[in-house]
Amino acid sequence: MIIKPRVRGFICVTTHPAGCAASVREQIAYVAGRGPIERGPKKVLVIGASTGYGLAARIAAAFGAGAATLGVFFERAPLDAKPGTAGWYNSAAFHDEAAALGLYAASINGDAFSDEIKQKTIDAIKRDLGQVDLVVYSVAAPRRTHPKTGITHQSTLKPIGQAVRLRGIDTDNEAIKETLLQPATPDEIAGTVAVMGGEDWRMWIDALDAAGVLADGAKTTAFTYLGEKVTHDIYWNGSIGEAKKDLDRTVLALRDKLAARGGDARVSVLKAVVTQASSAIPMMPLYLSLLFKVMKARGTHEGCIEQVDGLFRDSLYGAPPHVDAEGRLRADRLELDPAVQAQVLELWDRVTDDNLYALTDFAGYKTEFLRLFGFEIDGVDYDAHVDPNIRIPNLIE
Protein backbone atom coordinates (compact mmCIF):
# COMPACT_ATOMS: atom_id res chain seq x y z
CA MET A 1 0.00 0.00 0.00
CA ILE A 2 1.00 3.65 -0.47
CA ILE A 3 0.93 5.57 2.82
CA LYS A 4 0.60 9.35 3.00
CA PRO A 5 0.40 11.55 6.10
CA ARG A 6 -3.06 12.33 7.49
CA VAL A 7 -2.93 14.84 10.34
CA ARG A 8 -5.75 15.45 12.80
CA GLY A 9 -4.93 18.11 15.36
CA PHE A 10 -1.70 17.12 17.10
CA ILE A 11 -1.75 13.52 15.86
CA CYS A 12 -0.73 12.04 12.52
CA VAL A 13 -3.02 9.03 12.16
CA THR A 14 -0.81 7.31 9.59
CA THR A 15 2.78 6.09 9.92
CA HIS A 16 5.34 5.08 7.31
CA PRO A 17 7.38 1.93 8.07
CA ALA A 18 10.20 2.70 5.63
CA GLY A 19 10.39 6.30 6.83
CA CYS A 20 10.60 5.24 10.48
CA ALA A 21 13.36 2.78 9.59
CA ALA A 22 15.27 5.46 7.69
CA SER A 23 14.96 7.83 10.65
CA VAL A 24 16.40 5.19 12.98
CA ARG A 25 19.31 4.60 10.58
CA GLU A 26 19.98 8.37 10.47
CA GLN A 27 20.23 8.45 14.26
CA ILE A 28 22.48 5.39 14.34
CA ALA A 29 24.77 6.99 11.75
CA TYR A 30 25.04 10.14 13.87
CA VAL A 31 26.09 8.21 16.98
CA ALA A 32 28.46 5.91 15.10
CA GLY A 33 30.03 8.91 13.39
CA ARG A 34 31.06 10.33 16.75
CA GLY A 35 33.02 7.23 17.69
CA PRO A 36 32.77 4.96 20.74
CA ILE A 37 31.43 6.29 24.04
CA GLU A 38 34.31 5.81 26.46
CA ARG A 39 33.51 3.80 29.60
CA GLY A 40 29.90 3.51 28.42
CA PRO A 41 27.23 1.10 29.67
CA LYS A 42 27.17 -2.54 28.59
CA LYS A 43 23.72 -3.82 29.60
CA VAL A 44 20.94 -1.25 29.43
CA LEU A 45 17.24 -1.15 30.25
CA VAL A 46 15.29 1.67 28.61
CA ILE A 47 11.75 2.21 29.91
CA GLY A 48 9.92 4.12 27.19
CA ALA A 49 12.29 3.01 24.42
CA SER A 50 10.36 3.42 21.17
CA THR A 51 10.23 7.13 20.33
CA GLY A 52 11.89 10.46 21.03
CA TYR A 53 14.43 10.68 23.81
CA GLY A 54 13.96 7.09 24.96
CA LEU A 55 14.68 5.73 21.48
CA ALA A 56 17.68 8.05 21.24
CA ALA A 57 19.01 6.68 24.53
CA ARG A 58 18.66 3.12 23.27
CA ILE A 59 20.49 4.01 20.06
CA ALA A 60 23.27 5.85 21.91
CA ALA A 61 23.78 2.92 24.28
CA ALA A 62 23.81 0.27 21.56
CA PHE A 63 25.63 1.99 18.73
CA GLY A 64 27.82 4.30 20.81
CA ALA A 65 28.77 1.93 23.62
CA GLY A 66 28.07 -1.47 22.06
CA ALA A 67 25.54 -2.22 24.80
CA ALA A 68 22.99 -4.99 24.95
CA THR A 69 19.61 -3.28 25.30
CA LEU A 70 16.22 -4.28 26.65
CA GLY A 71 13.44 -1.85 25.74
CA VAL A 72 10.01 -1.44 27.31
CA PHE A 73 7.25 0.39 25.44
CA PHE A 74 3.51 0.40 24.79
CA GLU A 75 2.88 0.40 21.03
CA ARG A 76 0.20 -0.82 18.63
CA ALA A 77 1.15 -3.52 16.15
CA PRO A 78 0.04 -3.27 12.51
CA LEU A 79 -3.13 -5.15 11.68
CA ASP A 80 -3.80 -6.11 8.06
CA ALA A 81 -4.02 -2.82 6.14
CA LYS A 82 -3.86 -0.62 9.24
CA PRO A 83 -0.31 0.54 9.99
CA GLY A 84 1.14 0.20 13.47
CA THR A 85 2.38 3.11 15.54
CA ALA A 86 5.63 4.89 14.74
CA GLY A 87 7.19 3.45 17.90
CA TRP A 88 6.44 -0.06 16.64
CA TYR A 89 8.27 0.55 13.37
CA ASN A 90 11.12 2.41 15.10
CA SER A 91 11.66 -0.57 17.38
CA ALA A 92 11.52 -3.09 14.53
CA ALA A 93 14.18 -1.10 12.68
CA PHE A 94 16.32 -0.82 15.81
CA HIS A 95 16.19 -4.60 16.29
CA ASP A 96 17.20 -5.20 12.67
CA GLU A 97 20.14 -2.80 12.86
CA ALA A 98 21.30 -4.19 16.21
CA ALA A 99 21.14 -7.75 14.90
CA ALA A 100 23.24 -6.77 11.88
CA LEU A 101 26.04 -5.81 14.29
CA GLY A 102 25.53 -8.80 16.56
CA LEU A 103 24.13 -6.68 19.41
CA TYR A 104 21.57 -8.16 21.80
CA ALA A 105 18.19 -6.42 21.57
CA ALA A 106 14.92 -7.53 23.14
CA SER A 107 11.74 -5.57 23.76
CA ILE A 108 8.68 -5.87 25.95
CA ASN A 109 5.40 -4.38 24.73
CA GLY A 110 3.00 -3.45 27.52
CA ASP A 111 2.07 -1.01 30.27
CA ALA A 112 5.28 0.05 32.03
CA PHE A 113 3.23 1.21 35.02
CA SER A 114 2.02 -2.34 35.74
CA ASP A 115 3.58 -4.89 38.08
CA GLU A 116 3.19 -7.52 35.33
CA ILE A 117 5.51 -5.71 32.92
CA LYS A 118 8.04 -5.02 35.66
CA GLN A 119 8.13 -8.74 36.44
CA LYS A 120 8.42 -9.68 32.74
CA THR A 121 11.34 -7.28 32.49
CA ILE A 122 13.07 -8.76 35.54
CA ASP A 123 12.58 -12.28 34.15
CA ALA A 124 14.09 -11.24 30.79
CA ILE A 125 17.09 -9.62 32.47
CA LYS A 126 17.72 -12.70 34.62
CA ARG A 127 17.40 -15.00 31.62
CA ASP A 128 19.41 -13.05 29.05
CA LEU A 129 21.59 -10.43 30.74
CA GLY A 130 22.01 -11.33 34.39
CA GLN A 131 22.11 -7.69 35.47
CA VAL A 132 21.88 -4.20 33.94
CA ASP A 133 24.26 -1.31 34.57
CA LEU A 134 22.05 1.53 33.27
CA VAL A 135 18.31 2.13 33.61
CA VAL A 136 16.85 4.98 31.55
CA TYR A 137 13.34 6.14 32.46
CA SER A 138 11.66 8.01 29.60
CA VAL A 139 7.93 7.48 29.99
CA ALA A 140 5.45 10.06 28.69
CA ALA A 141 1.82 9.08 29.24
CA PRO A 142 -1.45 10.94 29.78
CA ARG A 143 -2.73 8.49 32.39
CA ARG A 144 -1.54 5.78 34.76
CA THR A 145 -3.41 2.96 36.42
CA HIS A 146 -1.78 2.55 39.81
CA PRO A 147 -0.61 -1.06 40.21
CA LYS A 148 -1.46 -1.21 43.92
CA THR A 149 -4.79 0.66 44.10
CA GLY A 150 -6.18 0.06 40.60
CA ILE A 151 -7.08 3.76 40.40
CA THR A 152 -6.47 5.38 37.01
CA HIS A 153 -4.92 8.83 37.39
CA GLN A 154 -4.97 11.50 34.67
CA SER A 155 -2.27 14.10 34.08
CA THR A 156 -3.39 17.68 33.52
CA LEU A 157 -1.61 20.58 31.88
CA LYS A 158 -2.81 23.57 33.89
CA PRO A 159 -1.44 26.52 35.86
CA ILE A 160 -1.70 26.66 39.64
CA GLY A 161 -3.45 29.41 41.58
CA GLN A 162 -4.73 31.54 38.73
CA ALA A 163 -5.77 31.31 35.11
CA VAL A 164 -3.07 31.87 32.49
CA ARG A 165 -3.52 33.16 28.95
CA LEU A 166 -1.03 31.64 26.51
CA ARG A 167 -0.13 32.55 22.95
CA GLY A 168 0.23 29.69 20.56
CA ILE A 169 -0.30 28.41 17.03
CA ASP A 170 -3.48 26.78 15.81
CA THR A 171 -1.51 24.26 13.76
CA ASP A 172 -4.54 23.13 11.71
CA ASN A 173 -5.32 26.67 10.53
CA GLU A 174 -1.76 28.06 10.76
CA ALA A 175 -2.95 31.02 12.81
CA ILE A 176 -1.90 32.63 16.08
CA LYS A 177 -4.39 32.02 18.84
CA GLU A 178 -4.66 32.61 22.57
CA THR A 179 -5.74 29.92 25.00
CA LEU A 180 -7.04 30.61 28.50
CA LEU A 181 -6.10 27.81 30.88
CA GLN A 182 -8.01 27.64 34.15
CA PRO A 183 -6.08 26.72 37.31
CA ALA A 184 -5.77 23.08 38.30
CA THR A 185 -7.79 21.72 41.19
CA PRO A 186 -5.99 19.90 44.05
CA ASP A 187 -7.21 16.57 42.64
CA GLU A 188 -5.86 17.44 39.19
CA ILE A 189 -2.48 18.35 40.67
CA ALA A 190 -2.38 15.09 42.64
CA GLY A 191 -3.32 13.13 39.52
CA THR A 192 -0.57 14.78 37.50
CA VAL A 193 2.01 13.95 40.17
CA ALA A 194 0.78 10.34 40.24
CA VAL A 195 1.26 10.02 36.46
CA MET A 196 4.34 12.15 35.82
CA GLY A 197 6.12 12.29 39.17
CA GLY A 198 8.79 9.96 40.48
CA GLU A 199 6.75 7.14 42.02
CA ASP A 200 6.83 4.74 39.06
CA TRP A 201 10.55 5.35 38.49
CA ARG A 202 11.13 4.50 42.18
CA MET A 203 8.95 1.39 41.85
CA TRP A 204 11.04 0.23 38.90
CA ILE A 205 14.35 0.73 40.70
CA ASP A 206 13.05 -0.86 43.91
CA ALA A 207 11.76 -3.89 41.98
CA LEU A 208 14.97 -4.30 39.97
CA ASP A 209 17.09 -3.92 43.11
CA ALA A 210 15.02 -6.40 45.13
CA ALA A 211 15.34 -8.92 42.29
CA GLY A 212 19.12 -8.57 42.26
CA VAL A 213 19.30 -7.46 38.63
CA LEU A 214 21.02 -4.10 39.21
CA ALA A 215 24.79 -4.40 38.81
CA ASP A 216 27.18 -2.84 41.30
CA GLY A 217 27.86 0.69 40.07
CA ALA A 218 24.56 0.80 38.15
CA LYS A 219 23.24 4.20 37.11
CA THR A 220 19.72 5.39 36.47
CA THR A 221 18.41 8.58 34.93
CA ALA A 222 14.95 9.99 34.25
CA PHE A 223 14.47 12.52 31.47
CA THR A 224 12.67 15.81 32.04
CA TYR A 225 12.15 19.27 30.57
CA LEU A 226 12.32 22.47 32.61
CA GLY A 227 12.52 25.35 30.12
CA GLU A 228 12.91 29.03 30.88
CA LYS A 229 10.78 32.11 31.55
CA VAL A 230 8.55 31.77 28.46
CA THR A 231 7.38 28.29 29.45
CA HIS A 232 7.50 28.54 33.25
CA ASP A 233 3.82 29.36 33.82
CA ILE A 234 2.76 26.09 32.29
CA TYR A 235 5.75 23.93 33.21
CA TRP A 236 7.62 24.68 36.43
CA ASN A 237 4.85 26.76 38.01
CA GLY A 238 1.98 24.55 36.85
CA SER A 239 0.58 21.11 37.57
CA ILE A 240 3.36 19.45 35.57
CA GLY A 241 5.89 21.43 37.63
CA GLU A 242 4.59 19.73 40.77
CA ALA A 243 5.31 16.38 39.12
CA LYS A 244 8.81 17.55 38.18
CA LYS A 245 9.45 18.64 41.78
CA ASP A 246 8.32 15.18 42.90
CA LEU A 247 10.87 13.71 40.47
CA ASP A 248 13.55 15.87 42.09
CA ARG A 249 12.58 14.55 45.54
CA THR A 250 12.45 10.94 44.37
CA VAL A 251 15.93 10.99 42.86
CA LEU A 252 17.52 11.80 46.22
CA ALA A 253 16.34 8.50 47.74
CA LEU A 254 17.32 6.58 44.61
CA ARG A 255 20.76 8.18 44.65
CA ASP A 256 21.31 7.10 48.25
CA LYS A 257 20.17 3.55 47.44
CA LEU A 258 22.48 3.16 44.43
CA ALA A 259 25.43 5.06 45.93
CA ALA A 260 25.74 2.35 48.58
CA ARG A 261 26.94 0.07 45.76
CA GLY A 262 28.92 2.64 43.79
CA GLY A 263 26.01 3.68 41.57
CA ASP A 264 24.17 6.92 40.91
CA ALA A 265 20.73 8.33 40.11
CA ARG A 266 20.16 11.61 38.28
CA VAL A 267 17.40 13.58 36.64
CA SER A 268 18.58 14.62 33.16
CA VAL A 269 17.21 17.89 31.78
CA LEU A 270 16.89 17.92 27.99
CA LYS A 271 15.96 20.68 25.55
CA ALA A 272 12.55 21.28 24.01
CA VAL A 273 11.94 19.14 20.93
CA VAL A 274 8.93 18.22 18.82
CA THR A 275 7.19 15.17 20.26
CA GLN A 276 3.60 13.96 20.20
CA ALA A 277 3.35 15.17 23.81
CA SER A 278 4.82 18.64 23.24
CA SER A 279 2.71 19.25 20.13
CA ALA A 280 -0.42 18.94 22.28
CA ILE A 281 0.68 21.74 24.65
CA PRO A 282 -0.93 25.04 23.56
CA MET A 283 2.18 27.23 23.58
CA MET A 284 4.83 24.73 22.51
CA PRO A 285 4.44 24.82 18.70
CA LEU A 286 5.02 28.60 18.80
CA TYR A 287 7.89 28.33 21.27
CA LEU A 288 9.54 25.53 19.29
CA SER A 289 9.10 27.37 15.99
CA LEU A 290 10.84 30.43 17.44
CA LEU A 291 13.50 28.34 19.19
CA PHE A 292 14.31 26.50 15.95
CA LYS A 293 14.61 29.81 14.08
CA VAL A 294 17.02 31.28 16.64
CA MET A 295 19.12 28.17 17.29
CA LYS A 296 19.45 27.23 13.62
CA ALA A 297 20.69 30.75 12.87
CA ARG A 298 23.30 30.32 15.61
CA GLY A 299 24.25 26.82 14.46
CA THR A 300 23.25 25.29 17.81
CA HIS A 301 20.01 23.48 16.90
CA GLU A 302 19.78 19.90 18.19
CA GLY A 303 17.25 17.09 18.06
CA CYS A 304 16.76 14.09 20.32
CA ILE A 305 19.76 12.08 19.15
CA GLU A 306 22.22 14.99 19.40
CA GLN A 307 20.95 15.78 22.89
CA VAL A 308 21.11 12.25 24.26
CA ASP A 309 24.39 11.34 22.58
CA GLY A 310 25.88 14.47 24.16
CA LEU A 311 24.35 13.59 27.54
CA PHE A 312 25.99 10.15 27.46
CA ARG A 313 29.40 11.46 26.39
CA ASP A 314 29.52 14.67 28.45
CA SER A 315 27.69 13.83 31.66
CA LEU A 316 26.45 10.27 32.23
CA TYR A 317 29.82 8.81 31.21
CA GLY A 318 31.95 11.95 31.00
CA ALA A 319 33.84 13.88 33.63
CA PRO A 320 33.17 16.36 34.98
CA PRO A 321 29.43 16.08 34.27
CA HIS A 322 27.33 19.19 33.61
CA VAL A 323 25.40 19.38 36.90
CA ASP A 324 23.20 22.16 38.27
CA ALA A 325 22.80 23.23 41.90
CA GLU A 326 20.07 20.61 42.44
CA GLY A 327 22.26 17.80 41.12
CA ARG A 328 20.46 17.42 37.79
CA LEU A 329 22.45 16.65 34.63
CA ARG A 330 21.92 19.52 32.18
CA ALA A 331 21.92 18.91 28.42
CA ASP A 332 19.71 21.95 27.73
CA ARG A 333 22.48 24.52 28.08
CA LEU A 334 22.31 25.79 24.48
CA GLU A 335 18.54 26.31 24.65
CA LEU A 336 18.88 28.27 27.89
CA ASP A 337 21.69 30.49 26.58
CA PRO A 338 20.50 33.96 27.71
CA ALA A 339 21.03 35.35 24.21
CA VAL A 340 18.82 32.62 22.71
CA GLN A 341 16.06 33.15 25.26
CA ALA A 342 16.23 36.94 24.82
CA GLN A 343 15.71 36.57 21.07
CA VAL A 344 12.78 34.20 21.56
CA LEU A 345 11.18 36.60 24.04
CA GLU A 346 11.74 39.57 21.75
CA LEU A 347 9.95 37.80 18.88
CA TRP A 348 7.21 36.21 20.99
CA ASP A 349 4.62 39.01 20.87
CA ARG A 350 5.56 40.15 17.37
CA VAL A 351 4.40 36.98 15.62
CA THR A 352 1.13 37.35 13.69
CA ASP A 353 -0.76 35.27 11.14
CA ASP A 354 0.85 37.33 8.38
CA ASN A 355 4.49 36.98 9.47
CA LEU A 356 4.32 33.48 11.01
CA TYR A 357 6.61 31.95 8.39
CA ALA A 358 8.96 34.95 8.30
CA LEU A 359 9.60 35.36 12.04
CA THR A 360 9.51 31.70 13.03
CA ASP A 361 10.62 28.34 11.66
CA PHE A 362 7.08 26.97 11.62
CA ALA A 363 7.97 25.18 8.39
CA GLY A 364 10.76 23.38 10.25
CA TYR A 365 8.39 22.58 13.11
CA LYS A 366 5.90 20.98 10.69
CA THR A 367 8.67 18.92 9.09
CA GLU A 368 9.89 17.69 12.49
CA PHE A 369 6.32 16.79 13.45
CA LEU A 370 5.84 14.66 10.33
CA ARG A 371 9.25 13.04 10.85
CA LEU A 372 7.92 11.61 14.13
CA PHE A 373 5.66 9.40 12.02
CA GLY A 374 8.18 8.45 9.34
CA PHE A 375 7.41 11.19 6.81
CA GLU A 376 9.71 13.90 5.37
CA ILE A 377 12.75 11.63 5.70
CA ASP A 378 15.40 12.11 3.03
CA GLY A 379 15.84 9.24 0.60
CA VAL A 380 12.43 7.62 1.18
CA ASP A 381 10.15 7.10 -1.83
CA TYR A 382 6.71 7.98 -0.49
CA ASP A 383 5.06 7.03 -3.78
CA ALA A 384 6.25 3.44 -3.49
CA HIS A 385 4.15 0.63 -2.06
CA VAL A 386 5.19 -0.54 1.41
CA ASP A 387 4.13 -3.50 3.53
CA PRO A 388 2.83 -2.22 6.89
CA ASN A 389 2.87 -5.70 8.43
CA ILE A 390 6.30 -5.65 10.00
CA ARG A 391 7.10 -7.70 13.09
CA ILE A 392 9.59 -6.94 15.84
CA PRO A 393 12.12 -9.75 16.27
CA ASN A 394 12.71 -10.94 19.85
CA LEU A 395 9.56 -9.19 21.13
CA ILE A 396 8.17 -10.25 24.50
CA GLU A 397 4.43 -9.56 24.79
UniProtKB/Swiss-Prot annotation:
Keyword Lipid metabolism in record: yes
UniProt KW keywords: Fatty acid biosynthesis, Fatty acid metabolism, Lipid biosynthesis, Lipid metabolism, NAD, Oxidoreductase
Catalytic activity annotation: a 2,3-saturated acyl-[ACP] + NAD(+) = a (2E)-enoyl-[ACP] + NADH + H(+)
Residues the UniProt record annotates as site (Plays an important role in discriminating NADH against NADPH): 75
Protein residues bound to substrate: 225
This protein's pathway: Lipid metabolism; fatty acid biosynthesis
An annotated GO BP: fatty acid biosynthetic process
Pfam families: Eno-Rase_FAD_bd, Eno-Rase_NADH_b, Enoyl_reductase
E.C. designation(s): 1.3.1.9
Keyword flag S-adenosyl-L-methionine: no
Residues involved in NAD(+) binding: 48-53, 74-75, 111-112, 139-140, 244, 273-275
GO MF annotation terms: enoyl-[acyl-carrier-protein] reductase (NADH) activity; NAD binding; trans-2-enoyl-CoA reductase (NADH) activity
Signal peptide stretch: none
Residues at the catalytic site: 235 (proton donor)
Cited PANTHER family: ENOYL-[ACYL-CARRIER-PROTEIN] REDUCTASE [NADH]
Subunit architecture: Monomer.
Family to which this protein belongs: Belongs to the TER reductase family.
Job description of the protein: Involved in the final reduction of the elongation cycle of fatty acid synthesis (FAS II). Catalyzes the reduction of a carbon-carbon double bond in an enoyl moiety that is covalently linked to an acyl carrier protein (ACP).
Name of the molecule in the record: Enoyl-[acyl-carrier-protein] reductase [NADH]
